[in-house]
């Protein structure tokens, strides 16, 4: 049975428990066995992590032993997928730059706080994740992130909506959802869902998340079928 590991915790304001339960249900419906943990100790064994098809992060504003991040990095490098949303992934561990390097971005602001009305614009391309999806409105936090230029952007939103010091710059399209690779592993991120009910109010947000998680998990099968190794990525030089 293909397995998914979800670890949830951190700041309760992002409702990690209901969000992780939602993601677990979506992946079970897709045919995966799901394990949900409320402790980071599930990340202690890198070889066990590498057996999963997908790791889902749902942990905001936390601290983590760097060894655990290295374990996730090891597993993803071997082909395990990594996915998450909102602050549960890209504001999970502010002090760990390897985590930010692996995930592709870091939250820095949500101008205006919660309850901001904005549009999510789907960027159609080669990714199956966005096929058939249309632009959709969201009322939630409007996430401004610092992002890795290597990401493949799947959806964007226009800034500024709320005036602040950043609005003296030209209008920009901020990535909302993206994919990238980490070694042989696939990484998916979606900045939506300050609260769990965002996925109910904007069903396309949930569909985007479901497709992204499945896409990331399917990378494990590809790595196994093609006997991919990590030799070309390994380096003992100082990285951080």
Task: Kindly label every feature range from the protein language model.
Residues 3-6, 12-92:
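Helical hinge/lid and interdomain linker segments adjacent to catalytic or ligand-binding clefts
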Residues 7, 37, 156, 190:
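Hydrophobic residues at beta-strand termini and immediately following loops
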Residues 2-3, 29-30, 168-174, 182-240:
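Extracellular ligand-binding/catalytic regions of CAZymes and related secreted enzymes
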Residues 11-12, 62, 89-91, 158-161, ...:
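Short, solvent-exposed loop/turn segments at secondary-structure junctions
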Residues 99-107, 136-152, 192-193, 206-220:
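Oxidoreductase and adenylate-handling cofactor-binding alpha/beta cores
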Residues 63-132:
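A glycine-rich, often tryptophan-bearing local segment used as a flexible ligand/cofactor-contacting loop or short
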Residues 28, 51, 108, 113-184, ...:
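Catalytic beta-strand/loop cores that center a nucleophilic Ser/Cys/Thr
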Residues 81-83, 152, 186:
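Proline-centered loop/turn at the N-terminus of a beta-strand
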